[in-house]
Regions:
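Cys-dependent protein tyrosine phosphatase-like superfamily
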Residues: 1-112, 128-171
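Short cysteine clusters
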Residues: 116
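Conserved G/P- and acidic residue-centered "switch" motifs that form tight phosphate/ATP-binding loops
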Residues: 119
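Ser/Thr-glycine-rich phosphate-binding loops at phosphate-binding pockets of nucleotides
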Residues: 123
Length: 171
């Protein structure tokens, strides 16, 4: 049984993502937060979804799920894995590592996609923190912007708190 099959059994939402990917050949919930630069997405479940992502212009991926994507899927792109449990938030060091990864990739004209399982909680947290550091938004404004562009984003109080703490950490 492969990694994604194990995750499908352990997390029912992953069954939907796997079926969606087989039919649509693209991950769930993909959208650009910053046009052609920074995107959020649900978890890719096949190499054909990775191919679709690359065709959108993405050149770097951050995975926010407990398990990384298979190495064979990401061997030709810049990749960062920040293991974070569902509905929780990464710590300040992990957030800053992800935000700096995004900024460094964008400086090299390498569009970035951040994903978790559904592409809303952990993904939204990192996207909001990027907006705080590099778009100079307040925590509240960053959360509002991410939620406007990606409805349902930032799912838990701990994620909202982490975004607020990151803002304070920087200021």
């Amino acid at each position: 049984m492969d990694l994604l099959s194990i995750e499908c059994v352990s997390k029912p939402g992953n069954i939907w993502r796997k079926v969606h990917g087989k039919i649509a050949k693209k991950p769930t919930n993909f959208s650009w937060l910053i046009d052609n630069k920074l995107a959020g997405s649900g978890m890719p479940t096949s190499i054909s979804e990775i191919d679709w992502i690359l065709k959108q212009g993405v050149r770097s991926i951050i995975t926010m799920t407990e398990n990384s994507l298979p190495e064979s899927w990401v061997k030709n792109i810049k990749y960062l894995h920040v293991p974070t449990e569902d509905f929780s938030a990464p710590d300040m060091q992990q957030i800053d590592e992800a935000v700096e990864f995004i900024q460094n990739r964008l400086k090299n004209n390498e569009p970035v996609m951040v994903h978790c399982a559904a592409g809303i909680g952990r993904t939204g947290t990192i996207l909001a923190c990027y907006l705080i550091k590099y778009e100079k938004l307040s925590a509240r404004d960053a959360i509002q912007k991410v939620r406007k562009e990606r409805p349902g984003s930032i799912q838990s109080e701990s994620q909202e708190i982490a975004i607020g703490l990151y803002y304070k950490f920087l200021n």
